[in-house]
């Protein structure tokens, strides 16, 4: 089970730090599915394609982040639920 979260982040001068995050929904990822692909499908339901064209997915292992390409600001994340 993965946790899809909306992220509010602050720039600390060197990088982005999560200020708050809000649970959006639980996401089931089957063992035969790629979590990154499932995350992208969730992003497509959450944002318009025009907005997504300005974003990229960053894979940090247990956390996938949708980040704005120009600034690196995280806007949505999916992490393994504990």
Regions found by a protein language model. Give the residues of each.
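A short, structured loop/turn motif at beta-sheet edges
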Residues: 31-35
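N-terminal acidic leader/helix
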Residues: 2-30
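Short amphipathic, charge-patterned alpha-helical segments
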Residues: 38-43
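Short, mixed-charge low-complexity intrinsically disordered segments
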Residues: 45, 49-82
């Amino acid at each position: 089970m993965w946790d899809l979260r909306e992220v509010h982040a602050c720039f600390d001068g060197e990088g982005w730090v999560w200020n708050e995050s809000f649970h959006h929904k639980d996401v089931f990822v089957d063992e035969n599915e790629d979590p990154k692909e499932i995350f992208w499908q969730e992003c497509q339901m959450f944002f318009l394609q025009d907005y997504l064209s300005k974003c990229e997915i960053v894979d940090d292992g247990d956390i996938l982040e949708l980040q704005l390409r120009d600034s690196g600001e995280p806007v949505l994340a999916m992490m393994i639920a504990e």
